[in-house]
Structures are given as C-alpha cells and as structure tokens.
Amino acid sequence: MTYQDKVKCSTKASKMGGSQIWFKENEELTVDEALKAICVVSANDVTVAMAEKIGGSEENFVKMMNDKAKELGMENTCFKNSHGIDEEGHYTTAKDIAIMSRELITKHPDILKYTSIWQDTLRNGT
C-alpha cells in the first residue's frame, strides 16, 4: 500500500459514531489523508474504512490486530473493533499500548509525521 492509494468509504464506515470527519459513502481519501484523519481527528469513520481496506472487513482486521498483539507479547489486550470505542470485552493496558507504540514507531517512523500534527486540513482545504 502506498500513501497515494485510495481508501473508499463503505456504508458501515459512513455510519460510525464518535469522533469523525463525516466520511460519506463511496467518498475516497488517499492513504496519506486517511492517516492524517485517523491520527489528528481520531476519525472513527476513516479508521473503519482503512481497516476494511487492509483486512477486507473490519472483523478480519480486528483478528489481525489481535494476532499481532499476541505476537508482540501484549498479554492483557483484546480488541473487539478497529476504532477503540468501548465495547464489551475490548480492553488493554498502558504496558501493552507501550509495547504496540514501540513497534509502531520503530517499524513505521513516518507515523510521527502524522501524530505531531496539531491542526491541518483535508479535502482541498476543509
């Protein structure tokens, strides 16, 4: 996947609650724009769309998340969704988040480009 690949909004993603950018069904963002929306705005709608792009479905992506958590030694984590909104059985610890964060920053240092943004625009300046 490249930063210029497209992430398309599904019906499910467009109906997400919580923090969002009002991603409309069939609207597309580049991966670059999607990462910005996820990291800066905590956009749950875009998070679901990205999960669907990577995993084929959010459910499969969550399985991938849990498999990776086990591989990393995150012993007190169980993901139930991709966006982090409270759900029965969805939990983690500060220690496990630290393990995940170390892996993310070590293997994908470009993420710091997004997580250090305080305020920015998407969709041609909006």
Region roles according to the model:
Residues 11-13, 25-27, 52-54, 83:
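A mature extracytoplasmic/lumenal domain signature
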Residues 16-48:
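Conserved catalytic neighborhood of penicillin-recognizing serine enzymes
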